[in-house]
């Protein structure tokens, strides 16, 4: 009986430890986004639907808002499916060309790689993909299976 209790206690401690190490929006990703992206993508910027109403020229000079979990996820799952991944990608997925926002993930290669890995881990195993909602060119649209891999704990 004592061995069973000890084994259960050890198992619970291991599970709690694994959960504590998983990145969350509140503890990890949100503060990094605020620090690295907030100056251009903060609370004063338009949300996705308002940003999309701007003309093409204006959208080139006004950044969309990504200061919260819901506004961030707009560019992961829908309606801006995959946009976050395409912008932050280090180029190892996109044929050697980093996304246009990758450079802002940190001041050094090491910091950028660390922050990118944190976002990838937070999204979930296999959730990092560059697909849009609809197919474009040779790139197919995102699948239900790909979207189901997004975990992104709050």
Predicted ranges, named:
Residues 11-19:
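Hydrophobic h-region of N-terminal signal peptides that target proteins for export
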Residues 21-154:
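Aromatic- and Gly/Pro-enriched helix-to-coil junctions and flexible linker segments
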């Amino acid at each position: 009986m004592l061995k069973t209790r000890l084994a259960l206690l050890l198992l619970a401690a291991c599970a709690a430890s694994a959960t504590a190490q998983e990145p969350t929006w509140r503890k990890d990703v949100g503060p990094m986004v605020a620090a690295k992206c907030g100056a251009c993508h903060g609370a004063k910027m338009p949300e996705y639907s308002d940003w999309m109403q701007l003309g093409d020229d204006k959208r080139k000079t006004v950044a969309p808002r990504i200061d919260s979990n819901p506004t961030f996820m707009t560019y992961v799952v829908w309606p801006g499916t995959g946009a976050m991944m395409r912008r932050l990608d280090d180029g190892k997925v996109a044929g050697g060309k980093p996304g246009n926002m990758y450079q802002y993930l940190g001041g050094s290669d090491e910091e950028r790689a660390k922050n990118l890995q944190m976002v990838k881990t937070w999204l979930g195993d296999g959730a990092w993909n560059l697909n849009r909602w609809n197919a474009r060119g040779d790139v197919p649209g995102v699948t239900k299976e790909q979207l189901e891999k997004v975990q992104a704990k709050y």
